[in-house]
Curated annotation (Swiss-Prot):
Functional summary from the UniProt entry: Catalyzes the phosphorylation of the beta-carboxyl group of aspartic acid with ATP to yield 4-phospho-L-aspartate, which is involved in the branched biosynthetic pathway leading to the biosynthesis of amino acids threonine, isoleucine and methionine.
Record bears the keyword Cell wall biogenesis/degradation: no
Pathways involved: Amino-acid biosynthesis; L-lysine biosynthesis via DAP pathway; (S)-tetrahydrodipicolinate from L-aspartate: step 1/4; Amino-acid biosynthesis; L-methionine biosynthesis via de novo pathway; L-homoserine from L-aspartate: step 1/3; Amino-acid biosynthesis; L-threonine biosynthesis; L-threonine from L-aspartate: step 1/5
Organism: Bacillus subtilis (strain 168)
Domain named ACT: residues: 312-388, 389-454
InterPro entries with a match to the protein in the record: AceGlu_kinase-like_sf, ACT-like_dom_sf, ACT_Aspartokinase, ACT_dom, AKIII_YclM_N, Asp/Glu/Uridylate_kinase, Asp_kin_monofn, Asp_kinase
Entry's EC annotation: 2.7.2.4
Top-level taxonomy: Bacteria, Bacillati, Bacillota, Bacilli, Bacillales
Recorded GO CC terms: cytosol
Assembly: Monomer.
Family of the protein in this entry: Belongs to the aspartokinase family.
Keywords, comma-separated and alphabetical: Amino-acid biosynthesis, ATP-binding, Diaminopimelate biosynthesis, Kinase, Lysine biosynthesis, Nucleotide-binding, Repeat, Transferase
Protein name listed in UniProt: Aspartokinase 3
């Protein structure tokens, strides 16, 4: 059995949905289909999820958003008309959407989640209707009826363990299962969404619950590339990588696959195949527990911007019990999460995403560190990019760090910080945002130029 997930770009038009139909029906093993909301039909288009967010926010502010709501309905209507479906499905989507928008707004976060989730929910209903119209037995399955229960954390739901046993019962159903991605239900019966792009997570949860043999994730690229294609022309494709490698790359800016989505599949030992809806015959990228490390130490290079660092210096810091814990506790008390903590004997650097810390919070954090920890020096540096060099084979290859540092030096990129995880799956380099592209290109040239990568 295979669980198949299609992203928004694969479902943005009737023509795309017809491709999905042929992909699903070409393989009898594909029994469960997880769908996103319609994405962009063309470059200047707006994703349905973004329309719904704007619609919900305007309803919360003014109690009305007729133009935005009709724009959402129109996206579904265009798809339905392309597929020659009747108007009844569109009228149902319109009625359900307006009922939802005019519903209870006493909890704005939960209201926003319910409206956002309707993008996937209505698309699943439309897709199930299309499959039936084409003569295929297909059933829309509501996550609540299937028993997909999650924590009550709007916008950041975590699956509850009992869900997997509930979902296993879906194996008993005949025909195709069409399942909306991105959300589950709290035990109180409220719609709660995963983090953005959370349909990947739903697919992985469903694959785990159904004990699938394979989780296929269809998107709009032929494979996972070894580097961002906007930085390097015609980068190498990766045919196989491990869960840990994919997690590191997804975290650091690879947008092909949601980093949280690997966890349910990983725990069940289910391989993940990333494929292209527009070129389904391409082999794609397979994510597995273990792979042969025969093609060099590095499998991919990823980068992301929008970071800042808090540098803390104090003489004899290493002799002070609990210093690091107390520093991180100050961040916790300000509602801040951190990414990395490289350290020395008399200093430590806390790296975090700068978007979560405004000027007032920054001043408060600095003051607390100076007063509570009696730090000799506290310096905050903004506009940093983190570059991750990833590969399971790095632990078995001497000199990988030296090669990376030398490549950056020769490209005249100043390394602001460097950190290597204890697992040795990745190395992190911090550079100025303005030097991100140059740094990534230099590292790609060092590790991939002229080398066959798989």
């Amino acid at each position: 059995m295979k669980v198949v997930k299609f992203g928004g770009s694969s479902l943005a038009s009737g023509a795309q949905l017809d491709k999905v139909f042929h992909i699903v029906t070409s393989d009898p093993a594909r029994k469960a289909v997880v769908v996103s909301a319609p994405g962009k039909h063309y470059a200047e288009d707006t994703k349905v999820t973004d329309l719904l967010i704007a619609c919900a926010e305007q309803y919360l502010a003014t109690g009305s958003a007729p133009e935005l709501a009709e724009a959402v309905v129109e996206r579904y209507a265009l798809i339905a008309n392309e597929l020659q479906l009747g108007q009844s499905i569109i009228e149902k989507i319109r009625d359900d959407l307006f009922t939802l928008l005019e519903g209870d707004k006493s909890n704005p976060e939960q209201y926003l989640d319910a409206v956002k989730a309707s993008g996937e929910d209505n698309n699943a209903k439309l897709i199930a209707a299309y499959f039936r119209y084409k003569g295929v037995k297909a059933e829309y399955v509501n996550p609540k009826d299937a028993g997909l229960f999650v924590t009550n954390e709007p916008g950041n739901a975590q699956v509850l363990p009992e869900s997997y046993q509930n979902l296993y019962r879906l194996r008993e159903r005949d025909g195709l299962i069409i399942f909306p991605g991105f959300f589950g239900f709290s035990k109180d019966g409220d719609v709660i969404t995963f983090s953005r792009s959370g349909s990947d997570i739903t697919g992985s949860i469903l694959a785990n619950g159904l004990q699938a043999d394979l989780y296929e994730n269809f998107t709009d690229v032929d494979a996972v590339y070894s580097v961002n294609p906007s930085f390097v022309e015609n980068p190498k494709e990766i045919s196989e990588l491990t869960y840990r490698e994919m997690r590191e790359l997804s975290y650091a800016g690879f947008s092909v696959f949601h980093d949280e989505a690997l966890i349910p599949a990983f725990r069940a030992g289910i391989p993940v195949q990333i494929k292209n809806t527009n070129n389904p015959s391409a082999e794609g990228t397979r994510v597995v527990s273990k792979r042969d490390n025969t093609n060099g130490p590095v499998v991919g290079i990823a980068s992301d911007t929008g970071f800042c660092s808090i540098y803390i210096s104090k003489y004899l810091m290493n002799r002070e019990i609990g210093f690091g814990r107390r520093a991180l506790q100050i961040l916790e008390e300000h509602g801040l999460t951190y990414e990395h903590v490289p350290s020395g004997i008399d200093d430590m650097t806390i790296i975090l995403r700068q978007g979560q810390m405004d000027a007032a919070t920054e001043r408060s954090v600095i003051k607390r560190i100076e007063e509570d920890l009696h730090a000799d020096e506290v310096i905050v540096e903004h506009h940093l990019a983190l570059i991750m060099v990833v590969g399971e084979a790095m632990r078995h290859n001497v000199g990988t760090t030296a090669r990376a540092a030398k490549a950056l030096s020769e490209a005249q990129v100043n390394i602001e910080m460097i950190n290597q995880g204890s697992s040795e799956v990745s190395m992190m380099f911090g550079v100025k945002e303005a030097e991100e592209r140059k740094a990534v290109q230099a590292l790609y040239q060092e590790f991939f130029a002229g080398v066959l990568i798989s």
